[in-house]
Every structure is written in structure tokens, then in C-alpha cells.
Amino acid sequence: MADYLLEIGLEEIPAHLVTESENQLIERIKNFFSDNLLDYKKIQTFSTPRRLAVLVHDLSNYSQSKDEELRGPSLKVAKDESGNWSRAAEGFARSQGTSPAEFDERDGYVYLNKHIEGVSAEEILKKIGIEVVEKMKFSTYMKWADFKLEYVRPIRWLVSLLDSKIVPFQILDVKADRFTRGHRFLSGGKISISEAGDYEETLNNAYVIVDAKVRKNSIRNQIRKIADTNDWNLHVDPDLLEEVNNIVEYPTAFAGVFDDKYLNLPEIVLTTSMRDNQRFFYVTNKQGKILPHFISVRNGDSNQIENVVKGNEKVLVARLEDAEFFFEEDQKHNIDFFMKKAERLVFHEKIGTMTEHMKRVEKIAALLANQLAFNDQEKKDLKRAANICKFDLTTAMVGEFAELQGTMAGIYAKIFGENQTVCQALSEQYLPTSSEGDLPKSKVGAMLALADKLDTLFSFFAAGIIPSGSNDPYGLRRAALGIVRIIGQQKWNFSVSKLLHSLKTAVDKHEDGFLIDFADTKEISRKVIEFFLDRIRQQSSDIRYDLLDASTGKVNEGIINYIFKRVRILASHVADPDFRDVIEALTRVQNLAEKNKSNVEIDPELFVTNSEKRLYQLTKDKDPIVLLSKGDHTVYQFLASLKEPINNYFDENMIMDKNPIIKNNRVAQINLLNNLISSLGDLRKVVVK
């Protein structure tokens, strides 16, 4: 047994790529050892902005031996007419280091049983550069010198040690050795690692805390200690903590101060300036009010920390001075001033201006508000919010702090005299901003956010701008997922197809300055609905694949909330004792209906058996949409109650009766029943055992 160390030394990696690169490295290492039949006890991973590393403990000295059977050429090819081994057979044997005499013959082929002895770990590890290091994939790449290899950042050194022995390999002009690098400023030159197991201690002595988890805990403890000492409430944003952890190798926390006059700025401006722009942690008093202090972390020790504090304070104050100036300047104008400027703001060159976008958002919001029974005041507030929703994009503050779009619209709207409902809706219009982000809390805000995202999708799809692969520069996947989540939260039921058709009627590209042509609404809605289905599958990744396929199989005009309900309904009943029997009865109907379509009206006078009459009485007045809208389980409970009547129906009746009139009536009844069952989707895709 031995310990093996691999370290990839790099120029500074962007903070957001460090953790995912570390995770990728350990997965590739595990796969490498699995493929090469090398056993080990455990693997430690390490990462800093300048390195990715693994330390493998108790690695076997040799890979496992194995026996394998290789299939060679067919007997027709392996032997000639006289039964002698052909050149093809001899070539196959030679390639495996044996002779045809070792062949087994069966099933028309020759086979070779081969015993493969284990290979030394050292020999296997020589391939780790090509099979692991070079195969790493990243979302961002760099090229350096005149090399063809692209990597997240240029490779500057490599360490490859099996206990104390160097395992050689080379990538470009960098040869693996035992020399690492310490902290860029606190440690000088190359540092020799005697043994693989000494890695962490060696780097600790060189001012590098190489274990990301240890480093993060150190940061957390240091900043909490400062906050506790000063009786501050500390707000530790986990994303900010992760980012700070990935830009330092030897963290030292410190506190800074700024003039309390800047506390007159909106709180979000202060926290954005500190958190997003400077990577500072803000603090509050016990009542939750922001204090004129911050906590930050330097990449180094406490030597001359006072200079670092002053420098960070100076940078923050400059940022806050700008914010204060922009805030005061913007208040010298009004919403109409900014709306006028928005007429020149391009939404997209193929789609039109931001003003045109706002007009379409207002149309969509109005259509949905009428359909979903908003009251008069809600409609009035929604119309006002939609009409001015993007005015803040032309303010000086958002021009400098782009991440505050929407938020500043709500703040400025309040200053300019808009009512609270409009202000809140404006501040919520971009929510959710991520797959797990907060949703709008107000009804009007949810509708504004929904309408904004719907127009974005409709417009880009109409212009032929549809995401492909991982490429999504306009965030359309995020918008679609936001739509799905808002609809699920609000339980709003509306048809995407009908909405788009109504929008086409309301929006004429030759009037009111609209640029988009929604001519082919059927094709646009088909693509948009399929796009939504992909997001629903993503949002429901915890649910069995077959239930997802079944739920998203048959879509009723793109009523997104109903699709969401289907997924959850099936998932909640899959463990029922009679689930299999229910699904089998219902899919029997769906299979027949798929093969036998009918537009014939059912004539109850043609019923022959009691089972026909009973099934008709149970289903004749049922509307699948009404069933779905009543509650999450109403539709399933109703369909499950039809299990016995359906089974009796098939036991007593021959659907394809010799009498064509009887047959057509029964086929029509099967199609009526299928229409109800399909409200849950294509249940033939459900896997029952």
C-alpha cells in the first residue's frame, strides 16, 4: 500500500470554477482507478485559486488480476475450406500474445480465454496526465504560448508522488516533479514535498490552507469572532462565503468602517456595493439596521493589516460616493423622463425597443388578468406597473449597478408617488432570478413577472432565437423555469396556445410600433410548450422518469399548471396498493382509443349491456379540465373508481362488434373515456410491476 499525490498548479482560477473543478477532478480520479482495477482506501481532495489536488490513501501496489473472454473472428473467417487456421485467426491470436491452439470454438466463433496479471500502480499512474489531467472540461478556457491545449488557466507545475517516489508524466512543457508552490507573496520559490502524505502540512507551513473545507471554516470562524467582539449581527451569505473562500489561500479577516452619511442610501444599494462589488460581509445592529461597518478577508497574514483595512475602506467609499451621486441625480427627474429615454433602448435588434416590449407585457398581463378574474383595482395596478416596468433601466443608478434593475424601479416608484402595490410589483418583476430563487410575494407582482417572461419567450421564439445545446445567452431557460414556478405557486390555469393567439390579435406589427410578427402562432406555441415541458422535467427531477414521460405526454393547449398537477398526482399515488390495477385498466382504454379514433356521438339507446350503461352514467357529464382544476387528487380518485366498471365493460362487451352500428357506438364510448383518462397524460408510459 502507498499514498499517491497529484497536484495541478495553475494561474489563478476564477472563483466560480474552483469548487466545480475540484469535484470534477475527484470523479475523474475515481473513474481512472476503477477502469484500471486499482483499489484504495479513501481520496482527499484539495483546491485553492492556484491548485487542484488529490491525495489517495492506501493505494494498492498492483491492479487486480482478471480473466476475460475475447471473441475473435467467425469460424467461416477463422478457418479455410480444409479446416486450417486462416491468416485472420493467426493475426487475432498473435495480437493477444498466444496461438490458435488456445482457441475455444462455439456459436460459430472462436473465443480466447485470457488471464491478465495485475500491473504495478506506478506504471498505471504514468497515464494519469493523459487520461485525467488533460481530459478535464471547463466552461471557460485559456490558451497560452503557442500550445494547442486549452485549459481553465495555464498549467505552471505538476506534482506526482507515490509515497516519496516521483511518478513521471508531462503535459506540454511541464514535467511532473515533487516541487509545489506556497503562497504567492508569503512563501518564496519552489517547495519540495518529501512524501505524498506530507502534502497538507508542507503547504500549511508555506501559508497555504489547501483543504477548501478547512479554509472555509477558518473564514467563518474569523468573521464571526469579529462580529461577536463588536456586538454586531453578521449576515453570512453562503454564496459570498464560497466565493471568498475560492479567492484566498491564507485567509485573514478584518473589519472596516465608512461614514454613516451613506446609510441614507437604500439598503439594497449598500449591501450590493459591499457584497457584490467588493466581496464584503455587511453587519447590522440587533434591530436589523445596517451599520457603517463591514468585514472582509485578505489573502495573507495580519502583517500591516491596517494598510489593507484603509485600502478597502477607500475603495468602498468611492463606490458609495458614486451611488450617492447617482441616487440624487435620478431623483431630479420623473418616470416620464426615464420612459422617454427607454424609447431609444433596444430590447433586441430583431425584436424592437424596450418600450415595445413593455407594450406587449401590458397586453399579456391584461389578457391574463381578465381570464384569471383579477379585480378592478388589481387590473388598474397591474396596467400601471406593466406600462412603466422598465423605466429604471435608463436611470444612472441602474446604469452603474445593473444588478439592481427592478429593485430600483420599486424604490424610485415609491419616491415618485406610485402606490405600494405598483412599487412592490416593479421590485418583483425579475423574480425568480435562479432555479431556487425567491418567487414574487404579491399577486400583481407575480403576474407582471409572468407576463414579462412570457413576452420574452414568445418574442425570441418568434424571431427564431431559440437556445440550442448549452448556449442560452438571453436566459430563456431561466425565464421558462421562472414561468413554470410562478404558475405552480399561483395555481393559475391558462392555455399558452390561446394566450399567444390572443396576443397576435392584440399586437399588429404594423401598428403601435410593434416589430415582432406572431404570424405562425401554432408553430411558435408548439415550440414554447415543448420548451416548458423540458423545464418541468428539470423541476421534477426527483420523480420517476416514466411518470414524467406519462405526465408530459399529452398536453392540453399548454396549460402548464395542469401538467405540474399530473406529475405530482401520479407520484403521490404510485405506492397505492391498487396503482398497478388502476393503470392497467386505464391504459387498456388508451391503447384501444389510439387504434380506433371516432367522432361519432354516443347514442345511449344503442347500449346492449348493463356495463355499457353504467360506465356511460359515470362519465357522461365529466369534464377532464374541471376534474383537474378541482384539486390535486380529484381526477385520480375518479379515474381509480372506474377500474371495476372498465374491467366489467371489457368482460361483457366485444368492442369490435359484428354490427357496425354497435361497434361505432362502443368505439365512441372508448374515445370519450380516453379523453377523461388523458387528463392525467399518456398512462401507457407508466412502468408498472
From Swiss-Prot:
This is Glycine--tRNA ligase beta subunit. GO terms for cellular component: cytosol. The lineage of its organism: Bacteria, Bacillati, Bacillota, Bacilli, Lactobacillales. It comes from Oenococcus oeni (strain ATCC BAA-331 / PSU-1). SUPFAM superfamilies: HD-domain/PDEase-like (SSF109604). It catalyses: tRNA(Gly) + glycine + ATP = glycyl-tRNA(Gly) + AMP + diphosphate. InterPro entries: DALR_anticod-bd, Gly-tRNA-synth_bsu, Gly-tRNA-synth_heterodimer. Tetramer of two alpha and two beta subunits. Its EC number is 6.1.1.14. NCBIfam families: glyS (TIGR00211). Belongs to the class-II aminoacyl-tRNA synthetase family. The gene is glyS. GO terms for biological process: arginyl-tRNA aminoacylation; glycyl-tRNA aminoacylation. It comes from the Bacteria. The keyword Coiled coil does not apply. Keywords: Aminoacyl-tRNA synthetase, ATP-binding, Cytoplasm, Ligase, Nucleotide-binding, Protein biosynthesis. HAMAP family: Gly_tRNA_synth_beta. It is found in: Cytoplasm. PROSITE patterns: AA_TRNA_LIGASE_II_GLYAB. GO terms for molecular function: arginine-tRNA ligase activity; ATP binding; glycine-tRNA ligase activity.
